[in-house]
Amino acid sequence: MRTARFSNPPGLCYVLRVPRPNAIQLGDEISIPILYEDRSVLVIDKPAGWMLVPYNWDKTGRNLQLALSSSILGGEFWARSRNLKFLKYVHRLDAETTGALLFSKSPGALKTYSEMFESRRMSKRYLAVVRGNPKRQEWTCDARLGPDPNLHGRHRTDAQGKDAETHFKVLEQKNGLALIEARPVTGRTHQIRLHLAHAGLPIVGDTMYGAPEDRTRKTALMGLRAIGLEYQDPFLRKRVKIEAPSKEFIEQFFLVS
């Protein structure tokens, strides 16, 4: 909350309280909702199409971290009203994945929350819309993952790769599609996408690991959304549970009969 003081006429003082915006404004057209905030972190509802770590210089035009840092440096009101000088992502979401993304407000917080992710003290939940009919209502995939030596930026299941584990639960099935809750234990690159493809359930709109009809559509909406983060906060000394809205995401795939 910002406070402005002014007097008119002399001797009469007014206090104007301007609430901090509940969204990050990047330019005139891009508004990113803020899902949660405390003194150490800020969680946004990441839109599709923004990368956090561009894998080549041709992709830097949609670099979310760069855009946020530039906005803070430029003194935009959403940042100025919070007296923000630092904002850095703690974990990553793929470019086309939407949903809850946690940022730290200081280098110290970045170190603390990064260690929490690395030590698996952060519980994460995703929704995935896949093609096909799951054979089981619940299952766990522990296929190991590694980079694909034949294509930069792509990964694959690899017996010699890093350990990876994801728990899955079917929530709904309709018209050859299934809505699945994914709870990754580890945080490997493209983990949920690869584990579902490995199960014969490619994510709708996944142009890298999806079904043939999705790989040829470069503008398809990808059916993967981060809907929850939960952790014991070391600074607030309480359990924090953050949820991203999911109704609109689900309706984009399941309202069409």
Range-by-range predicted roles:
Residues 2-257:
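RNA pseudouridine synthases
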